[in-house]
């Protein structure tokens, strides 16, 4: 639940000054464009300055990361791997790669790669093929036979072309059985009531444990033919063993070049992958969060629960990174002042942490993305997620600098500011302070926002159910927004002027109320947690500040704009909403949470929605962005000893995914 997805892909990030460490190459930043997607390359500045052991560690961790790719596809939908492999076979074997039908087929395959399956990575809606079923059946007849068939042709066509079948990967609509109506592969043969009862029994049996495990995090819940409900655990020897064995192989190599502290962390992760015991996962997390000195770091595992409608099952992901020493200075200042921020938060004092422990924050350079972090990735991460670990041992927060930089370069000169920002003064602020405001918002969100506050006695942390992710992201965003406008940030040298905050306030309200709507199909509701969070904050503040015209909707030349008229009063509203959101989380107030989310975060004004889509389309700006990864190659001497690691930047999206399919695909087609 602690991952920040920025809105850079929409073009909100303005022209800004760039770090000298980031050198623009001659290659274009955008390497592919299709449908609502742009694919961007990212660079890895500073890699050449790492020690040989650090470079080698990154190589092994990157190999481990790529070995988990199939897991994410399978978690998203039971038939994803069979479908992907069938499409890849047709694509690679097709003699004629021309014509409208093939172009539509290629676009569909690119979308499947990007989303790790046949459902959109953000809206969760199933893709609609733009090629005909008749043409597709011809390709199946030509290129699919008994030897390479992954799925029966009729079932495949029904899945692809029947709009009602498996229509949504994640359905959180009010009043539906979110388990039955979601196509994700976390549950099979069970309904929502059965799932909730199964895990509630576990929670009740462990009610007095101050260090509870994350029940159900690393398993699929199924019902057998006799009606017995049980977990298929994701571990070596269990579900996904073929991929996990490869991951562990590379982790074992990584341990040989890691420093002693990190070696212990890696060995703990290996132990967990072998046992599947969530107590081992907690032990690994405690060791991982305590390692704040290692220059190279990584995430590898079943981490975030966004893809589960009940917020219990975790998707597999990996991020390999190293420290951006210069940029870390700002996060070190934040971490040093963490107790002050906690003590002065505008929330009930009972819900403040008396002692903030283990706050570790840094700015990182990503070296490899995988699983649920590839191709689309977060711009900030705060882990671990277990409340008791965060309270007793702290958390690690990171801002991913080279990713935000790549988004920035890809967005420059796209005309977004001129189209959607009404006032010249706001455009000027965005130009001068937009990048700094975005970076600091991410830092505050991850470093302090997620780690702030505490639960009331008796609250377990799972009471908010389907609304928990939205509320948690709103809580962290509000914390960041509130403190961005505090003179304390000027005092400690994080910002030169409050104009940095006002730039972010204008951006945030505009995006939450208006511009993010371009990502949603006309007539649909807002489903994704981060989008719901931003809409909730923007619309609540608009409504509560309406009497004093704090935020204003302006019509000019037939176009709608949203402007902030009073930044100080808006900050006060952020504080008031943060107080209520923290109360809801601390007390586990499900009904209040439901009312807040359903009242402000879900439904869209259809006229405004249509206008935003049309204006955004005229700019030819894809609302979503993702990445191609760099490649690493070991350089050895005549005796086979590693003497260096070579870094290259592939710039072909299709080639990278076909290469991954050939070299890093280990799971059966149906799991």
Model-assigned labels for residue ranges:
Residues 43, 481-584:
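Long, well-structured alpha-helical subdomains associated
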Residues 110, 114-223, 229-427, 434:
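Contiguous, non-catalytic segments that form substrate-binding/exosite surfaces or channel walls
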Residues 570-671:
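Extended, compositionally biased alpha-helical segments that mediate assembly or anchoring
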């Amino acid at each position: 639940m602690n991952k920040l997805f920025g809105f850079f892909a929409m073009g909100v990030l303005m022209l800004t000054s760039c770090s000298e460490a980031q050198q623009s190459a001659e290659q274009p930043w955008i390497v592919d464009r299709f449908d609502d997607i742009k694919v961007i390359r990212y660079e890895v500045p500073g890699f050449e300055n790492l020690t040989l052991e650090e470079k080698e560690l990154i190589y092994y961790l990157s190999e481990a990361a790529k070995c988990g790719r199939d897991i994410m596809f399978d978690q998203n939908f039971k038939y994803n791997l069979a479908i992907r492999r069938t499409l890849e076979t047709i694509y690679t074997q097709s003699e004629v790669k021309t014509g409208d039908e093939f172009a539509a087929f290629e676009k569909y395959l690119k979308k499947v790669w990007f989303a790790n399956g046949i459902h959109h990575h953000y809206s969760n809606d199933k893709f609609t093929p733009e090629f005909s079923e008749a043409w597709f059946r011809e390709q199946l007849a030509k290129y699919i036979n008994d030897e390479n068939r992954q799925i029966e042709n009729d079932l495949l066509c029904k899945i692809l072309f029947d709009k009602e079948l498996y229509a949504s990967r994640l359905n959180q609509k009010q009043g539906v059985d979110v388990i039955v109506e979601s196509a994700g592969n976390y549950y099979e043969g069970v309904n929502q009531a059965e799932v909730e009862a199964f895990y509630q029994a576990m929670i009740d049996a462990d009610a007095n444990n101050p260090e509870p495990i994350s029940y159900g995090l690393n398993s699929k819940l199924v019902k057998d033919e006799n009606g017995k409900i049980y977990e298929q655990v994701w571990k070596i020897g269990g579900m996904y063993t073929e991929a996990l064995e490869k991951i562990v192989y590379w982790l074992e190599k990584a341990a040989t070049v890691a420093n002693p502290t990190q070696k212990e962390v890696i060995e703990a992760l290996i132990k967990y992958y072998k046992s599947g015991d969530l107590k081992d996962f907690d032990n690994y997390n405690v060791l991982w969060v305590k390692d704040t000195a290692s220059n190279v770091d990584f995430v590898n595992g079943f981490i975030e629960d966004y893809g589960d409608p009940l917020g219990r099952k975790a998707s597999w992901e990996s991020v390999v990174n190293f420290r951006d020493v210069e940029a870390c200075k700002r996060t070190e200042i934040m971490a040093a002042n963490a107790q002050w921020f906690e003590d002065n938060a505008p929330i009930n004092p009972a819900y403040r942490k008396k002692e903030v422990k283990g706050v570790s924050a840094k700015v990182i350079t990503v070296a490899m993305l995988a699983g649920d972090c590839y191709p689309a990735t977060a711009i900030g991460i705060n882990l671990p997620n277990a409340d008791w670990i965060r309270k007793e041992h702290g958390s690690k927060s990171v801002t991913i600098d080279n990713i935000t930089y790549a988004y920035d370069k890809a967005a420059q000169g796209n005309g977004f500011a001129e189209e959607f920002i009404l006032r010249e003064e706001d455009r000027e602020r965005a130009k001068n302070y937009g990048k700094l405001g975005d970076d600091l918002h991410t830092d505050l969100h991850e470093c302090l926002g997620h780690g702030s506050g505490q639960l009331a006695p008796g609250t377990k942390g799972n009471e908010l159910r389907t609304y928990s992710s939205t509320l948690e992201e709103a809580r962290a965003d509000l914390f960041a927004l509130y403190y961005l406008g505090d003179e304390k940030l000027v005092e400690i040298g994080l910002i030169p002027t409050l104009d940095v905050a006002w730039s972010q306030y204008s951006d945030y309200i505009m995006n939450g109320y208006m511009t993010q709507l371009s990502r949603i199909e006309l007539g649909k509701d807002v489903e994704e947690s981060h989008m719901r969070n931003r809409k909730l904050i923007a619309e609540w503040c608009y409504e509560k500040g309406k009497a004093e015209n704090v935020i204003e909707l302006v019509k000019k030349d037939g176009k709608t704009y949203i402007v902030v008229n009073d930044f100080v009063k808006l900050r006060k509203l952020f504080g008031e909403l943060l107080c209520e959101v923290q109360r809801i989380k601390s007390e586990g107030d499900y009904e209040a949470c439901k009312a807040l989310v359903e009242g402000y975060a879900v439904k869209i004004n259809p006229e405004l929605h249509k206008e935003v889509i049309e204006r955004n389309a005229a700019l030819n700006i894809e609302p979503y962005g993702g990445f191609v990864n760099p490649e690493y190659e070991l350089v050895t001497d005549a005796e086979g000893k590693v003497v260096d690691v070579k870094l290259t930047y592939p710039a072909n999206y299709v080639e990278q995914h076909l290469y991954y399919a050939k070299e890093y695909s280990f799971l059966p087609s149906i799991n």
